[in-house]
Amino acid sequence: MKKENAIRYYRKFSGADAYILGFVYKHDLYCITVDEIMPRFMRVEKSSSKKGGHEKLQFRLNNALKEQLIRKGAEKIGTETDLLEIAGNKGVSFERMIYRINGQEPRPKDSVRFDKGGDININGVEYQIKLDGAQIVEFRTLNKIQKERKSA
């Protein structure tokens, strides 16, 4: 599957209304809310052979993109160290920070597949939460959802 097709299917199947994106820049932690994850923020990568070596979309930001997001209004919400103090996994730590900022209790890890809803609901809006370096979706998951919807 090509990157463009994977992005199109991801957007078509996503249960999120918007996205909360996080990244570290010069040791500060930022977040920004966006309607869509832009294609230039995504790369096609392969998971490790230990995890099956499957192709996937990965959320990746270089410094130029981080600077652009800061100019567009990304807010500083902490430091890189804050990500390490909450949990062993930076992505989980970021999600917990977003829950805490919004006065909510975190959901159990990976309790909802991306096509069924977001990671957090804020005022009736479903948001997916992604920290720089996070997996967006494996191509095989997109294929599985396609087959499920065709047979439904």
Question: Across the structure, where does each feature detected by a protein language model lie?
Answer:
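Acidic-basic catalytic patches of nuclease active cores, encompassing PD-(D/E)XK
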Residues: G15, G52-S111, K150
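Short intrinsically disordered terminal tails
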Residues: M1-E4, S48-K51, A152
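Acidic, metal-binding active-site segment of PIN/NYN-like and related structure-specific nucleases
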Residues: F13, V24-K26, Y30-R43
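Catalytic cores of nucleic-acid endonucleases
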Residues: Y19, E85-G88, I129-A152
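A short, surface-exposed interaction/processing loop segment used at functional sites
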Residues: F41-L57
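Nuclease-adjacent, charged terminal/linker segments that flank catalytic cores
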Residues: Y19-F23, L29-Y30, S49-G53
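Active-site beta-strand-loop-beta-strand hairpin of nuclease catalytic cores
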Residues: F114-A134
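A short, charged, amphipathic alpha-helix used as a generic interaction element across diverse proteins
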Residues: K2, A6-K12
